[in-house]
Amino acid sequence: MKKLLTIFSLILTLGLVGCSSTQEVKDIPVSDIKNEINNETLLTIQPVAETDAKDFYVFENVKDNITEGFVLQAMINVKLQDVFVVKTDDVEKVKQAIEDYKTNNLRMFADGYGGEDNATSVADSKLESVGDYVYFIAAPNASNIEAKILEMIK
């Protein structure tokens, strides 16, 4: 009877573990993410400047922690459209670097430089992390861009 109870418990445990859901992050190259979001539908302000995250001045102090990443920005300096996606081994350091950028460099946009759309983009900006990925979006349609990023990495 004990053997039967042990076997039943083992089968039940394996069944529950096998049926449980885990939310894993896919290991996708950030270049694939960039290709999916770098279009006129999601990035409405064209043309767009593309920069490797390791070469972008915001990440100067954390570039050794960056595995790969990109920065997309509007080439028109009075329109705010920033999209950063970085794969890193130190999420908190990269998030802090972006937070510093947001506080220091985006202040003029938050104060209304370039129009009300820019102030709204700063107020509605998104700085999040999922697994080893960190993304920052300050753009008129940040929610749509975020949805595309999450669709790809989850």
Tell me what each language-model feature is:
Residues 1-5:
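Positively charged n-region of N-terminal signal peptides that target proteins for export
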Residues 15-18:
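C-terminal motif of bacterial Sec signal peptides marking the signal peptidase cleavage site
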Residues 20-23:
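Bacterial signal peptide processing site
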Residues 26-46:
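Post-signal peptide N-terminal segment of mature Sec-exported envelope proteins
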Residues 48-80, 93-94:
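Short, compositionally biased low-complexity segments enriched in polar/charged residues
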Residues 81-89, 133-138:
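Second-shell loop/turn segments in exported
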Residues 91-131:
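Short Gly/Thr-rich strand-loop-strand
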Residues 117-154:
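A short, solvent-exposed beta-edge/loop patch
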